[in-house]
A protein has these predicted regions:
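Alpha/beta-hydrolase superfamily serine-hydrolase fold, recognizing
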Residues: 2-304
Length: 304
């Protein structure tokens, strides 16, 4: 066998590596053991949260998972959180246990409907496909605001006057992108009140070799400071959550400063988890630092 077939040009553990012949091979998924951590939909007996999967686009194959809190009384209407998962744009899924369990908790604690988009992943689908899929999903969701969309749960249970976009890490980047797109190009139907960005992943001053490989341009998608539409971002408030020991903390802090200087007329909230690292609430959900982080998000959603 020709040993050159195994020569790599790029290696980005724990995500993927690129061979000299152009092949791309993913490392074992850090969010699930070979698919064994996929969680089926149904009723969560401990929380009363129900889940189902929906097809957003048959053409692209993009789907999403819906989370509905326990229903008490007739004709309930809940705020909606449109969520985008993390994973450096190249791994993760709302169907994985690590994200599913977190979103069950969010639906329960905030008493909201959550829809989490399973966008296509880089590098097999080059950036900005993840962002384009996520914006298309937001438009599909918005088509339900008149009660006539294709998904009954969205028609029946969502108060489209109270919509939020949210995400962690790369998903926070996508949530920001969707909010800016909604403000710059318009989004008919829903009232997007705010954005929740947890441990956001934006471009920084130091080179990021993996991002440079996946998206080799200093584009507004990764660098909000060069986005001429930043001040048009939809919503009246943003919550940025960082972790003290997260290597991305400075980028979250910088995002707050950039947004405040942009001319955007909303309020910028900031929450920091002490002594914790990137995505700790996913990897260690029993940490006592998860409770105040969740409370910050719940309060942000439920406060007028």
């Amino acid at each position: 066998m020709d040993s050159s077939n195994n020569e790599t040009t790029h290696e980005f553990p724990p995500y993927f590596k690129v061979y000299k012949d152009g092949r791309i091979e993913r490392y074992p998924d850090r969010f699930g053991n070979g698919g064994q951590d996929l969680v089926p939909t149904g009723l969560d007996s401990k929380t009363g949260v129900q889940t189902k999967d929906v097809v957003v686009s048959p053409e692209s194959g993009v789907s999403a998972r819906l989370f509905i809190p326990k229903i008490n009384g007739p004709d309930p209407k809940f705020p909606l959180v449109v969520h985008y998962h993390g994973g450096a744009f190249c791994t993760g899924s709302p169907f994985k246990k690590i994200f599913h369990d977190f979103l069950v908790s969010l639906a329960l604690e905030a008493n909201v409907v959550v829809i989490s988009v399973d966008y296509r992943l880089a590098p097999h689908h080059a950036l900005p496909v993840a962002h384009e899929d996520s914006w298309a999903a937001m438009q599909w969701i918005s088509a339900h605001s008149n009660g006539q969309g294709p998904e009954p749960w969205l028609n029946q249970y969502v108060d489209f006057g109270r919509v939020f976009v949210a995400g962690e890490s790369a998903g926070a980047n996508i949530a920001h992108y969707v909010a800016v797109q909604a403000g710059a190009t318009g989004l008919a139907g829903p009232n997007v009140i705010g954005s929740i960005l947890v441990h956001p992943y934006f471009g920084g001053k130091e080179p990021d070799k993996m991002i440079d490989y996946m998206y080799p341009t200093k584009d507004r998608i990764l660098y909000p400071e060069v986005d001429p539409n930043l001040s048009k971002m939809v919503g009246k408030k943003v919550l940025v959550c960082v972790a003290e020991k997260d290597w991305l903390k400075d980028r979250g802090v910088g995002y707050c400063e950039t947004l405040r200087k942009s001319g955007w007329n909303g309020s910028v909230g900031y929450f920091e988890s002490e002594e914790e690292g990137h995505g700790f609430f996913l990897w260690n959900p029993s940490s006592d630092k998860v409770v105040p982080l969740m409370k910050a998000m719940v309060d942000f959603i439920n406060q007028n």
